[in-house]
């Protein structure tokens, strides 16, 4: 089986005045179809730089990045934008929803740039994506009419709507309390059971226990790449939490 993405000896350097910052120092790993991988690291570890490269928002200084069989490291900006819109689904910590746009319209957004998808098909796929995250009853609500957890569900639906080869999640539980975080991880685990490939960036060790594999970055180097032998079930973890009225975050 070929990997969905392959990172080979990736380096990323930034010029800061007279100094050069080595954000990534020769990192290599593969992610295969159907994997749920956590990329962990503290501030300064290089995980945000890595996510920018994985998301085709930045290019490495050297090394190879192959996504779905295609080399990306030498592509021009327009070609990278096309890859982002067709092959990648993004979920951000701050949701990044348009405030004056309904949930379903937010979910439809990635398909607006795909001329091969009709308005009717775009609407149908957005409804299906919202159903997958349990928000079909809120599709006409504006973001300010939704809770933080519901807004993140809309963001996940938006990431699903173009049927990406991989979902890239950046601290997707970072703005949520523990109960809501576990609810969101339940969705990611269910999507993974359905065959979705997920790369989830986090600095929270407890969130990493819900994935099947953890890659740890430190000082721009890959320090660990381990298979999680005891994957925690997010639904069971959620049900084990104290009731909301007794819950002390």
Predicted regions and their residues:
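Conserved beta-strand-loop-alpha-helix hinge in the C-terminal portion
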Residues: 221-246
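ABC family nucleotide-binding domain
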Residues: 2-217
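Short, Lys/Arg-enriched, disordered terminal segments
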Residues: 1-3, 247-248
């Amino acid at each position: 089986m070929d990997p969905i993405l392959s990172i080979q000896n990736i380096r990323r350097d930034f010029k800061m005045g007279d100094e050069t910052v080595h954000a990534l120092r020769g990192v290599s790993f593969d992610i295969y179809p159907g994997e749920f991988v956590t990329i962990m690291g503290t501030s300064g570890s290089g995980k945000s730089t890595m996510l920018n490269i994985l998301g085709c928002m930045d290019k490495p200084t050297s090394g190879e990045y192959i996504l779905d069989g295609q080399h990306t490291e030498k592509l021009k900006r327009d070609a990278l934008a096309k890859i982002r819109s067709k092959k990648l689904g993004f979920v951000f910590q701050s949701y990044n929803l348009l405030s004056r746009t309904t949930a379903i319209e937010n979910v439809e957004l990635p398909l607006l740039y795909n001329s091969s998808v009709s308005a009717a098909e775009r609407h149908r796929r957005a409804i299906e994506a919202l159903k997958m995250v349990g928000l079909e009853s809120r599709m006409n609500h504006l973001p300010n009419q939704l809770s933080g957890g519901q807004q993140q569900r809309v963001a996940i639906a938006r990431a699903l709507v173009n049927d990406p080869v991989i979902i890239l999640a950046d601290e997707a539980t970072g703005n949520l309390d523990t109960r809501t975080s576990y609810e969101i991880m339940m969705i990611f685990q269910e999507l993974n059971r359905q065959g979705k490939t997920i790369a989830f960036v986090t600095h929270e060790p407890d969130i990493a226990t819900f994935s099947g594999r953890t890659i740890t970055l430190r000082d721009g180097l890959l320090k660990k790449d381990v298979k999680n032998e005891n994957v925690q079930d997010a639904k069971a973890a959620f049900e084990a939490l104290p009731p909301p009225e007794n819950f002390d975050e």
